[in-house]
């Protein structure tokens, strides 16, 4: 590779396809962190959530605002087909040495390595650069392996992670130039626009690169993205021998979004479909872990004061974005967006579901920092009939947890009750309100 070829690759890797867009909180935090070369900045998240876009915007800021020479920024996207043959430690080192030949020694050096997980031995390269230079190092990846490898363990606290989610509902509205209501009058003025966009958000999610596409193209983009995640990030990466099992597992999760399930239940379901006869719950468990490593799905455990029950096999699985669950029921779409809101505003390890010995279920239990417990029920259409059932469940939860009780909430999308009265000790809140900043 010549320096001219490298310069062209860097230019193409760092090119912004469009200017503007909303300013995400991650962007501000990343800019602040760029002041000092250490620690290493690691950006993780599902494919197409905006990781590369954040790097590209920082690249432009460094050049256009901070005056950093373009020759001092090595920006490599390892999904570029020109770098497929360079996805090894020796080639990466050679590219780095070539890059250094034109660096301006009076300015800092920046190393941007996008989708680094494809490079065999990348950990040793980054560790060497970190230990021997004052370069600013940024790496991105669509696999949690980045932070579970020996690399992150050996570096200890010398890594600063930015985990990127798809757009929140607030960001989704901002991307369509809809302001966030600050008072009841603004809510009244903007209600129809917010309701329309919320229905879109619930159905198709908030992946930045998909939200502006026509509906038919959204589905095509979704299918292409799922195929890439399943084939490249799981089947190829982990060298799976039975790809049909993984695809059947994905379909199960999509059709049963938010259901309580175990590896054994899922294995039995897939076998009962007829195509796959031999499938162990151990294999299902391993494949579920692979999907979680791609950030595609997340699992929550049952809340219990008994450690054994918390670590039982019975979990609820959700997708990181609703574009991945279009085959689910509308009720499950709503529960999935509420889940994604809750893990943004809470420590994900403190988000659970609740279930008693008679099978009565609370959709979400939040353990707060003061150890108080919030209970949240999600109801797609609130009617006179199901209101009583949802209230009984929340009241039962409050009786079980009197000494630690926090808030009780019933989140709904449509209210079809004949009488819309308030309920003592329980907050009824429309989902579009729940997902926006509270004033």
For each of these PLM feature ranges, what is it?
Residues 1-31:
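N-terminal pre-Walker A segment at the start of P-loop NTPase domains
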Residues 75-106:
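Short glycine-rich substrate-engagement loop in P-loop NTPases that contacts/grips substrate
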Residues 54:
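Hydrophobic positions on the alpha1 helix immediately C-terminal to the Walker A/P-loop
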